[in-house]
Each structure stands twice: as C-alpha cells, then as structure tokens.
Amino acid sequence: CLMFDREYFEQGPMTGKSLYTNYRWMPELTIPLCHHLVTECPIRIDDTILDFGCAKGYIVHALRLLGYEAYGVDISEYAISQAPKEVNGYVQLIEPYAELPGKYTWIIAKDILEHIPYDHIDEQLSILHDATDDIIVMVPLGDGTKYHIDAYEKDITHHIREPLEWWSDRFKHAGFGIDIETHDLGPFKSNWQGIHPEGNGLILAYKNEKTFA
C-alpha cells in the first residue's frame, strides 16, 4: 500500500502524513508492552499470536524474545522490508482484506482498525473472526466526527472516529463475544489517559463460547 511508505513511518509530521518520526526498534518500550499483553490477556506460552498490522514487526520480535510463537502481517511493503532479520519468515506482506495466512489463538490489533474505511470494517472484522479464537484490540475513539484526542487527527490514514460502544457493536455483528470493553487501557496507553479519559478503547473478544480465565 503506497500510503504507508517511508515518509509515513520516518517523516510523518514533516510530510503531514502521520505522527511517526524515525519509526524504530525500541526494546525498552516494546518488550514491556508485550509482557503486559501476555499477562493481562492472558496469553499462554503455547498459544499462537498474529500481530495484525505489524508494521516493521517489532511486537512480533518482542513476543518471540519472550518465548511466544508470534507472527505478523501488514499491507505496507516498505514496513515489511524494514523488519529486523530476527523476524524473517515470521512477518509477511498481505493485500488489504485478504484472507489471513493461518489460524491463531490470538490476534492483536493495536492502533490498526481505525485505518479501515467504514465501508470495509465489517468485511475486515469477519476476516479476523475467521482466523482467531480471541482478539485484543486497542483503538482511538471519537464522537463520530472527530477524535477525542486531537493528535490522532494528524494521521491522514485514519478513517473511523467512533465511540467504544460503536466498536463493540461491530465486533458483535462479526460474530465475536465481548469479554472486556473499557476506556482504561492501564499500562498500554498511560501517556494518553490524562489527555482524555475516553480517548482510547480496549476490547477483548472471543469467537468460542468461553471466558478468559
């Protein structure tokens, strides 16, 4: 996808495309993030994980350093080409709205689904539903017109600006059950919580008839 190019990841503010500058491996941030992911969900050591919209594969890299079987997909040819050599064979380029390359215990969709146009979101959620047992989603929220956090408007690839209840309804429509839906992202978005208490949402959802232990 040409929109998610070098300028988007490396010179976002300068080019007016995104908030990203020099998008790089930062283990001091990504490894603790992944530790929180696997402990809060909880994700078991023998689970398989797909990072949907993995960009350069840093979450995949961190999860694998922690001993988890993690994979990633992204639509950005540039981002996948920049992935660290440690995740070669574990991350891959896909086409938008393509069937995912496997079946997974968990899918992580962190700051991804807001990039999907409204007329494709149900299709995309159905694709995710077909490929996983459980999913964890983090998404910026809005009032249907604008985001609660102004900075999120600076990414020109953002489409969906809806409240948490809207997202929850879309997941239910796709066949998921909702285990958790909350504005409190705890350790995942602590830097944004003080800006607006409903600026981000977290959803834990499941396909099978089960609850999280």
Residue ranges of each PLM-predicted region?
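Short phosphate-binding/catalytic loops that engage adenosine nucleotides
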Residues: 68, 133, 176
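Conserved N-terminal segment of class I S-adenosyl-L-methionine
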Residues: 1-106, 119-126, 142, 154-166, ...
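Conserved beta-strand signature within the Rossmann-like core of class I S-adenosyl-L-methionine
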Residues: 132-142
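Conserved helix-to-beta-strand junction in the class I
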Residues: 127-131
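Phosphate/nucleotide-binding beta-alpha loop and adjacent structural elements of enzyme active sites
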Residues: 164-175
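A short beta-strand submotif of the Rossmann-like class I SAM-dependent methyltransferase core
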Residues: 106-112
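A short acidic, helix-capping loop that chelates divalent metal ions and anchors anionic groups
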Residues: 145-152
